[in-house]
């Protein structure tokens, strides 16, 4: 009988930690996979049409390890870029997501601890996740479940069909989190920046070239640096190809294919728990420029939930209970009086039906306020449900300003 390389590796790893035992391809049956496992996205891999994709990552062979710098609200240790996720991107363009509903777990993620700790006895892994893989709303388990359901179900080399028949149930889920944390621990972004003299501060800014040089030199390839609306460091993405199965941990750094949105100079790196102060430059009577700091006092980004309701707002501004929450971005207006809200769809505002909506067609959406974690519009903080499109799990419902005739709720960040 032929076994995939993944099946044998999983069998060897079932009751040991990856750091406790080393094995090589020579331990595996010679006819399981190519002797020299292909590198994902390489010409060699693309020509192996008849080779089981349990042997190498396909078609999503670009592997990203992504990290957050969540400074407001402060999330995770003060000296750590926290884990965002382990993602697989297509070799050409785009990325798969939610690839196999049969493998998904409950979005609350409560089962994850019992699988990792109770079933596999790996309390060390669970503790590492609790320390470094943080959700800025404090819902770590839900965040882990989201990352597994969206990305972990898409890796070809840890599909359940790749494992031996006597492999324990949930081995693929356990392997996803173990591999993600293992790679994360090899990419200490905070330490690499600190070694180059780049540390969190509100008293100075850094250039893009300084940050790139510090990280690229350590990683061995160009990394992707993402900034938020305040020109503060927000995320770091590390791109890889992988040789053979994910279980071999043979990740090969490659240059980022994404382009930074950070400015060439003036990049902020605020300490956690502090606000990245936007700067306004004005001319003094002597002709020199003066920098004025205006604290925003609001989070740079957040999900938007409804008080007393499940679900959240998606990027078009509608309420949805079955999909992924949208990340909303918040910025004080120049006069510091109101808030501009954006999603990936564009600026958010109130339409003619007094419904909250976000799109590129919206303009001048700066009449929002945030008070005690609640979103208001022109000092109105109560909202109601509006019209619904679709049905069942795909239904999307608009939210509108309350008029006193409905059961109202609040929009919470």
Curated annotation (Swiss-Prot):
Residues making up the signal peptide according to the UniProt record: 1-18
Gene Ontology MF terms: ribonuclease T2 activity; RNA binding; RNA endonuclease activity
PROSITE patterns reported for this sequence: RNASE_T2_2
Disulphide linkage map: 33-55, 41-91, 54-162, 99-154, 227-262
Listed EC numbers: 4.6.1.19
One term under GO cellular component: extracellular region
UniProt record, GO biological process: RNA catabolic process
Keywords for the protein's UniProt record, in alphabetical order: Cytoplasm, Disulfide bond, Endonuclease, Glycoprotein, Hydrolase, Lyase, Nuclease, Signal, Vacuole
Active site (record annotation): 84, 147, 151
Major location category of this protein: other
Compartments where located: Vacuole lumen; Cytoplasm
Gene3D superfamilies, A to Z: Ribonuclease T2-like
Glycosylated position list: 128
Reaction catalysis annotation: a ribonucleotidyl-ribonucleotide-RNA + H2O = a 3'-end 3'-phospho-ribonucleotide-RNA + a 5'-end dephospho-ribonucleoside-RNA + H(+)
UniProt keyword Transferase present: no
Short name of one Pfam family: RNaseT2L_C
Sequence similarity: Belongs to the RNase T2 family.
Functional summary from the UniProt entry: Rnase which modulates cell survival under stress conditions. Released from the vacuole to the cytoplasm during stress to promote tRNA and rRNA cleavage and to activate separately a downstream pathway that promotes cell death. Involved in cell size, vacuolar morphology and growth at high temperatures and high salt concentration.
Protein name (record): Ribonuclease T2-like 1-B
Organism of origin: Candida albicans (strain SC5314 / ATCC MYA-2876)
Gene: RNY1-B
């Amino acid at each position: 009988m032929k076994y995939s390389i993944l099946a044998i590796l999983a069998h060897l790893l079932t009751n040991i930690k990856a750091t406790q035992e080393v094995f090589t391809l020579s331990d595996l049956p010679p006819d399981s996979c190519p002797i020299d496992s292909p590198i994902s996205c390489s010409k060699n891999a693309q020509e192996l049409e008849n080779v089981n994709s349990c042997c190498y990552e396909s078609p999503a062979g670009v592997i990203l390890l992504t990290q957050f710098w969540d400074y407001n609200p402060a999330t995770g240790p003060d000296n750590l870029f926290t884990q965002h996720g382990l993602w697989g991107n297509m070799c050409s363009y785009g990325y798969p997501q939610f690839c196999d509903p049969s493998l998904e777990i409950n979005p609350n993620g409560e089962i994850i601890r019992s699988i990792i700790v109770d079933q596999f006895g790996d309390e060390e892994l669970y503790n590492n996740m609790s320390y470094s893989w943080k959700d800025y709303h404090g819902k770590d388990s839900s965040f882990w479940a989201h990352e597994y359901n969206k990305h972990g179900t898409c890796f070809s080399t840890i599909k359940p069909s790749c494992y031996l028949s006597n492999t324990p149930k949930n081995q693929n889920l356990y392997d996803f989190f173990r591999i993600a944390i293992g790679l994360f621990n090899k990419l200490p972004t905070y330490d690499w920046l600190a070694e180059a003299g780049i540390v969190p501060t509100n008293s100075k800014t850094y250039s893009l070239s300084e940050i790139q040089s510090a990280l690229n030199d350590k990683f061995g390839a160009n990394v992707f640096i993402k900034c938020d609306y305040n020109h503060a460091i927000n995320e770091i993405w590390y791109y890889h190809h992988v040789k053979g199965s994910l279980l071999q941990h043979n990740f090969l750094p490659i240059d980022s294919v994404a382009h930074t949105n950070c400015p060439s100079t003036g990049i902020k790196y605020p300490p956690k728990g502090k606000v990245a102060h936007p700067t306004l430059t004005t001319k003094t009577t002597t002709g020199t420029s003066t920098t004025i700091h205006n604290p925003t006092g609001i989070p740079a980004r957040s999900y938007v939930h409804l008080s007393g309701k499940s679900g959240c707002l998606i990027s078009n501004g509608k309420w949805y209970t079955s999909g992924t929450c949208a990340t909303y971005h918040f910025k004080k207006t120049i006069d510091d009086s109101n808030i501009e809200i954006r999603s990936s769809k564009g600026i958010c505002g109130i339409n003619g039906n007094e419904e909250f909506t976000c799109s590129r067609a919206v303009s001048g959406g700066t009449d929002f306020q945030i008070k005690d974690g609640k979103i208001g519009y022109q000092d109105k903080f109560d909202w109601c449900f509006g019209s619904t499109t679709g049905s069942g799990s795909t239904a999307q419902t608009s939210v509108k300003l309350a008029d006193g005739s409905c059961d109202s709720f609040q929009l919470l960040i």
